[in-house]
UniProtKB/Swiss-Prot annotation:
Gene name for this UniProt entry: Chst11
Residues bound to 3'-phosphoadenylyl sulfate: 124-130, 186-194
This protein's name: Carbohydrate sulfotransferase 11
Organism per entry: Mus musculus
One annotated Gene Ontology cellular component of this protein: Golgi membrane
GO biological process: one example: in utero embryonic development
Membrane topology (Lumenal): 38-352
PTM field: N-glycosylated; required for activity and stability.
Induction description: By BMP2, suggesting it is a target of BMP signaling.
Reactions accelerated catalytically: chondroitin beta-D-glucuronate + n 3'-phosphoadenylyl sulfate = chondroitin 4'-sulfate + n adenosine 3',5'-bisphosphate + n H(+)
C-alpha cells in the first residue's frame, strides 16, 4: 500500500476520534446544564417532591443571616433567650461548668436530623414525644409521613432516632458547629409535678413503681407496709421531694431523665443552643423551628390535649404540703434551670 494512502487512512481515523470526542463532550455539557436548570428531585418522607437541600440555605443561615434586613420580633425574642443562657452560665460558672469536657455519653439526648441539619435535645415532660415524632418524619427514619400516626411508644424506641453520641468525635464536632441546635424547656416545678403525676400516680407504670417507688418508700416512709415496699405504687409527693433533696440519692446514681435538670441533660453551658423553645409558647416556637428548617409549608407541630396537662394551679396545690425547708432545698436543686431559662421564683414557694 502506498505511503500516501496510508497517511490518508490515518488522518481519517484521527478525524473520527476527534468527532466522537467532541460529540461526547457536547452530550455531557447538555446533561450538566439540564442538571443545573432541573436539580435532582427526591421523594421526601412527607410524600411531597422537594429539591434536595444542597445549595439551599441552612437553618443556621435562616436564623443568623435572614434575607430580610430587619430582625423579626420572634428572632429578637430568641436572641434574648440565648443571651439569658449565656449570662447565667457566666454568672454561675463554678456551679454550671463543674465538668469541663463532655463525653459522647453526655450527648445521648441530642437527636440528629442529617437531611435538615438539625440537632434537638429532648427533655422529658416538655412535649418530647411529639418532637420525637417530628424528628422521625423529618429524618425519614420510619414508615410514617404524619407525625400523629406514630404511636407514642414507637417514638421512644431508640433505634428510630439517631443521637449525637453515635458519631465519631470529629463528626460530633462538625455537627455541633454546623447544625442548628434547639431544645424546649418548661417551668421546672411544673415539669417536676408532671413527671410525678405520670410516673407515680398511674397504675400502668409498674416499672417505675418497682425501680423507684419501692426505693423511695423504703427510704422516706416510716412503718411502711410490706405491700407498699413490694409494689411501690403509692408514693406521696412529699416523699418524692424528700428523695430528690436527699444527698444520698445523686451520690448513688444520676437522677432519672424525667426529673433530671435541663442543664444536666442538654449541657447548655457547654453547647451553644441556637433556639430555646418554651412549653408556654410551644406551638409558636415549634413552628418557628420548622420554618427555619424549610418544612413549614407541609409540616406543623401536632396539637396536644390540654385537658390532661399539669398546670400552674395543680403545681401550687402539690406544693402546699411541702415544708419551707424542703422547698428551699428543692429550689437549690433546680436553681440553674430557673435562672437559665428566665423562670421567676413561684409565688407559692415559702423559701427560708
Amino acid at each position: 500500500m502506498k505511503p500516501a494512502l496510508l497517511e490518508v487512512m490515518r488522518m481519517n481515523r484521527i478525524c473520527r476520534m476527534v468527532l466522537a470526542t467532541c460529540f461526547g463532550s457536547f452530550i455531557l455539557v447538555i446533561f450538566y446544564f439540564q442538571s443545573m436548570l432541573h436539580p435532582v428531585m427526591r421523594r421526601n418522607p412527607f410524600g411531597v417532591d422537594i429539591c434536595c437541600r444542597k445549595g439551599s440555605r441552612s437553618p443556621l443561615q435562616e436564623l443568623y443571616n435572614p434575607i430580610q434586613l430587619e430582625l423579626s420580633n420572634t428572632a429578637i425574642l430568641h436572641q434574648m433567650r440565648r443571651d439569658q443562657v449565656t449570662d447565667t452560665c457566666r454568672a454561675n460558672s463554678a456551679m454550671s461548668r463543674k465538668r469541663r469536657v463532655l463525653t459522647p455519653n453526655d450527648l445521648k439526648h441530642l437527636v440528629v436530623d442529617e437531611d435538615h441539619e438539625l440537632i434537638y435535645c429532648y427533655v422529658p415532660k416538655v412535649a418530647c414525644t411529639n418532637w420525637k415524632r417530628l424528628m422521625m418524619v423529618l429524618s425519614g427514619r420510619g414508615k410514617y409521613s404524619d407525625p400523629m400516626e406514630i404511636p407514642a411508644n414507637e417514638a421512644h424506641v431508640s433505634a428510630n432516632l439517631k443521637t449525637l453520641n453515635q458519631y465519631s468525635i470529629p463528626e460530633i464536632n462538625h455537627r455541633l458547629k454546623s447544625y442548628m441546635k434547639f431544645l424546649f424547656v418548661r417551668e421546672p416545678f411544673e415539669r417536676l409535678v408532671s413527671a410525678y403525676r405520670n410516673k407515680f400516680t398511674q397504675k400502668y407504670n409498674t416499672s417505675f413503681h418497682k425501680r423507684y417507688g419501692t426505693k423511695i418508700i423504703r427510704r422516706q416512709r416510716k412503718n411502711a407496709t410490706q405491700e407498699a415496699l413490694r409494689k411501690g405504687d403509692d408514693v406521696k409527693f412529699e416523699e418524692f421531694v424528700a428523695y430528690l433533696i436527699d444527698p444520698h440519692t445523686q451520690r448513688e446514681e444520676p437522677f432519672n431523665e424525667h426529673w433530671q435538670t435541663v442543664y444536666s441533660l442538654c449541657h447548655p453551658c457547654h453547647i451553644h443552643y441556637d433556639l430555646v423553645g418554651k412549653y408556654e409558647t410551644l406551638e409558636e416556637d415549634s413552628n418557628y423551628v420548622l420554618q427555619l428548617a424549610g418544612v413549614s409549608g407541609y409540616l406543623k407541630f401536632p396539637t396536644y390535649a390540654k385537658s390532661t396537662r399539669t398546670t400552674d394551679e395543680m403545681t401550687t396545690e402539690f406544693f402546699q404540703n411541702i415544708s419551707a425547708e424542703h422547698q428551699t432545698q428543692l429550689y437549690e436543686v433546680y436553681k440553674l434551670d430557673f435562672l437559665m431559662f428566665n423562670y421567676s421564683v413561684p409565688n407559692y414557694l415559702k423559701l427560708d
